[in-house]
Amino acid sequence: MRSDIIVIGGGAAGLVAAIGAARELAKTENGGTVTVLEKMPKAGRKVMITGKGRCNFTNVKEWGDFSDHIRTDVNFVSPSWHNLTPQGVMDLLKSVGLRSVVERGDRVFPESHMAGDVVDSLLRCCTLEGVKVVTDCEVKTIDPTPRGFSLDCVQTSRKQVRIPVDDPRKLRPGKPAPTREELTIEPVEYTCRKLIIATGGLSYPGTGSTGDGYLWAEEMGHRVAPCFPSLTALVPVGYKNLETNPLADEIKTAFRGRTVYGKTKERKIAPLPKWYPTFPAHIERIVPLSALGEQFNGNTLENVQLTLLVGGDAVQTEFGDIEFTDGGLEGPLGFMVSRRAVKALNDGQKVAVELDLKPAVEVEKLDADIHERWQEIIHDERSKGQSFHRLFRILLGKLIPWNLTIPFLDTHADVSVDTLAAALKAWRMDIAGFVGFERCVVTAGGIDTSEVVAKTLESKKQPGLYFAGEVLDMDCDTGGYNLQVAFSTGYLAGQSAAKALNNN
């Protein structure tokens, strides 16, 4: 099968790359064809889970402020961002009926707060632009040719077939007969003149992000910067029951498809590329919580200050909300410091976080307030006969969420009325590790951007090859920045491929 431009990957970057390419081709007399190859049964799987299913799809900060949230080469991202700005993304989606709202922190969501509406809008736009989206099509190999590229793929066809029932009387009246899914797998070859790789990184492998693009880039001469999880949960010491840790198998969870079988049918692991890392500090999300972790789980602290400590030194301070989940420390604050924390842990450094639960109050004023409240409590008629521990917990409950009073006391065995203010201003948690690719939001690392032309996103190693999205070595903070960069790089890659096609 032939297409003028093929995009591998039907995620945020891939779908918008196809839209950009199709729009550019439509400007010419002869036009052209654009095809998206997506290996999952449905396109946009990872977009569906962003923002806890609400999809924070962009951030409307101006470039000067937006660029402060890019953690890699800002100059590389700039041409893409200015070519398709956040307003441009909103306008693109609005053109197919998606209305959006701007919330705190300049974050933009669909008005419906449903990520599925964003995916549906992107697919609707693809249809209107004449883009062909082929799902269940996994690219196995890419071979450059004199006229472009040849792709060997595996196409899966799905069909529901009825399950035979030995006795028709067993069928429920008005209910359909039972069925099962029957798969048909066959090889198929695609050829194209221009190729865009937008396969994503390694995060959330269940959505299809399993590092395929890195392999192809490496085969075509590109360097891949070591990858590691970013925007991920940090796991405090004592938070998880590490005795049951199954010793996270990064290969199985984040690099599926690399397993091979020998003559004895024993499962073996194929050699990993040099860029693929393993992490001693990786703690699988499925590791059960400890008793302490259970007490933390499900709680949120709002408007607090978090300081990241590496080797005892404060290296990053952020203000906002933090969530205690079954993974560890998450939410905006946990995610904002996770990139730096993961790098430090991977380097073997000691990492800790320090929470200031009352950042707007000086310690002296807080101490005076605590003593005043304590006097009120101990002189209250209802306090008669109550134990000191009970009264102290009542005091603490007036200062922090009640559900966090027990874990706070469990981690501050020697705290007293006189030392409580200092403890609330510096709640220290040593970090044991982090959740890996299986549940991180974004992959840090990727294809070296110095080997890609920033103004076109074309490879400097292989003419006619373009890259977009998370597969590149670029990542941002949480807050809609990563999706915006995916959209922007996708659109520029698509336009550039189409323009190059027209000029040939």
Give the residues covered by each predicted segment.
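Beta1/beta-strand and adjacent pyrophosphate-binding region of the FAD-binding site
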Residues: 1-13
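Glycine-rich FAD pyrophosphate-binding loop
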Residues: 6, 22-52
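Short glycine/serine/threonine-rich phosphate/pyrophosphate-binding segments
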Residues: 13-18, 199, 206-207, 486
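Conserved N-terminal/central alpha/beta ligand/cofactor-binding core
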Residues: 39-132, 137
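Residue-level recognition of phosphate/Mg2+-coordinating polar/acidic sites
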Residues: 42, 63-65, 73, 82, ...
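Flavin (FAD/FMN) cofactor-binding core of flavoprotein oxidoreductases
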Residues: 112-115, 231-239, 277-282, 434-451
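Predominantly flavin-linked oxidoreductase catalytic cores and closely associated redox partners
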Residues: 121-392, 396
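A conserved FAD-binding loop/helix module that cradles the flavin
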Residues: 203-216, 220, 474-502
